[in-house]
Amino acid sequence: GMKYITITTKHHDGFAMFDSKISDWDIMDRTVYQKDIIKQMAEACKKHNIKLFLYYSQLDWHHPDYYPRGDTGNKSGRPDKGDWENYLDYMNGQLTELLTNYGEIGGIWFDGWWDKKDADWQLRKTYDLIHELH
C-alpha cells in the first residue's frame, strides 16, 4: 500500500495552502474555502499511518523582498529593491509553522532555489532549523 504522500504547501506564486500567521496570502485569509488543507491532510495521514511529506517552493514571486525575480522573471518586473535577509527570515518562519503545527512530518521537498543560483540561500541555517524542529 501507499507509504507516503507529498502535498504542495506553497508554490512559486507564494500562496500558502496552510494557515500562515506570517502572511495573509494563504488559503484561510484569501479564499471562501477557509480551511487549512495541510491540517486536513496531516490528520488523514496520521489516521491511515501514511508519512506526510511537504513540498515548499523557496522562490516566491509574490513576496516583495524576493528581489530581483531571478531567472524566471529575467531579473525584471519590480522597480523596488527588496531585503534578501528579510525574505529568508520569512521563508524560515513559514517552515517553522509547517514543522510545528502539523504533527510528524516525513520530509520536505524544496524547489525553486535554482531561480537564483547565485544568491546566498543560507541553506545551512535552514537545514539547522529543520533538524532543530524535527
What are these regions (language model features)?
Residues 1-134:
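Mature catalytic domains of secreted/periplasmic carbohydrate-active enzymes
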